[in-house]
């Protein structure tokens, strides 16, 4: 009997009840909140459901010295093997492959000046970088935090895994949170920075883009961007490769796989492992609060920069060629959420003013811009 009691008591020390902390319970509630927002409020469910469940999974308490090989940071555990894709930077380029295979760059090709809006939105990244330095973060940490201004989760993970791996969980959750909150953050800012007259500007329909142009774009884009920032090659190379698969007309099956099955698998593993990395002991710190505050600042600056840059461009454009400033918010790389916001807000003020295709130009330019910015920061600090 004593043997049974002793073994039962030993068993109890392995349970989550015996090892739980207040931090674990708080993070489990955070994970549940993410899942609730995804399912009930439809806030990017494809991202927030895996991340939310990952947060819960990563904060299930267990005895660390038991050698069970179940924790994210325990060598040879299943979660640790999955996590290598985040830690070593494998998942983000594969996500970019899928994005490239899904994306139609016609809006940007037909109106190349829209790429300037995507470039202007990157001011949010460099503005947040300066503020992060002022708050006492190391330069490499500040760079990893600042990239959240692009609202681009894969880019944020890729850069932070190289420059600030100790902050990667908080940075990744921050980036994906602001991607999900695009419909909440951007519309009030767009109304604040534009007049009613500007919101009803009608833009001319984009010209038809030839198949030859669509094929040449990823090749020329790859050469131009990677010659400027070779360190962005893993992201930019896969983005343009995916787009070439889509546009070549001869690799449809590969493009479908990259944009559907492969992309879905990578997003599942990426979201789950990023969520698991937010363990209470590392996540519930003052630095996390600073990161979320800086992420919000970076995202607001990026969105505002795009809108204000369109207003600046309009000062030099002839009357019939002016741009609607509502497409300026789409300069961030939250594709296609920001472009949808531009379109929806435009329809509020003129139900015949469809801005979606116009907004997709700066939106896809923002994807390229954030990858270039990440490459520049990575090259600078390496």
Question: Where do the model's predicted regions map?
Answer:
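N-terminal alpha-helical transmembrane segments of multi-pass membrane transport
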Residues: 1-74
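Interfacial helix-loop-helix linkers and transmembrane-helix boundary segments
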Residues: 39-48, 81-82, 102-117, 251-259, ...
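Transmembrane helical segments that form the transport core of multi-pass membrane transport proteins
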Residues: 225-310
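Entry/N-cap segments of selected transmembrane alpha helices
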Residues: 107-129, 281-307, 359-363
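Alpha-helical transmembrane segments
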Residues: 166-184, 292-302, 326-327
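Alpha-helical membrane segments and immediately flanking helix-loop junctions
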Residues: 88-89, 96-102, 117-127, 131, ...
